[in-house]
């Protein structure tokens, strides 16, 4: 199946010069969504990525992470932006182009022996994915790999990540 045909290109969003890859059209296509989850599952299994938990990055990582966790018979844990989780959290601060941001995870969500797979819709520069891996490693988890629907090649995101399997379905 041609997933690129199901991903809408929006020029100049969110600012001029950016080509936004809109996955809402993929999400609304039942057969395409099923193919996406089935293909991610197959690629994870083939690569030996059998986690205890799938960790979804806010917020589109939740959309693919939950069904992937179900298929892999794993739990799902969200990583959120600051102030979105109600209980005590672990957090990590990371650099943005202009400033810093934080990611948080509930303190009781994972333990130091858990094996995790990190999932998001897209990898560009890799900053948020690396920060997520740093957060999980800080609490003692083993990061098995990453799974993304889209990779924006040429932005160096893959090179910032730990040396583990990285699964992508569509490259731009």
Swiss-Prot record:
Compartments it resides in: Cytoplasm
EC class name: transferase
UniProt-listed Enzyme Commission number(s): 2.4.2.7
GO terms for biological process, alphabetical: adenine salvage; AMP salvage; purine ribonucleoside salvage
Keyword Cell division: no
GO function term, MF aspect, one: AMP binding
Keywords assigned: Cytoplasm, Glycosyltransferase, Purine salvage, Transferase
Chemical reaction(s) catalysed: AMP + diphosphate = 5-phospho-alpha-D-ribose 1-diphosphate + adenine
Pfam assignment, any one: Pribosyltran
UniProt cross-references to CDD domains, sorted A to Z: PRTases_typeI (cd06223)
Family annotation (InterPro entries): Ade_phspho_trans (IPR005764), PRibTrfase_dom (IPR000836), PRTase-like (IPR029057), UPRTase/APRTase (IPR050054)
Gene Ontology terms: cellular component: cytoplasm
Pathway given in the UniProt record: Purine metabolism; AMP biosynthesis via salvage pathway; AMP from adenine: step 1/1
Listed PANTHER family: ADENINE PHOSPHORIBOSYLTRANSFERASE
Quaternary structure and interacting proteins, as annotated: Homodimer.
Family, per entry: Belongs to the purine/pyrimidine phosphoribosyltransferase family.
Main function: Catalyzes a salvage reaction resulting in the formation of AMP, that is energically less costly than de novo synthesis.
Name this protein carries in UniProt: Adenine phosphoribosyltransferase
Gene: apt
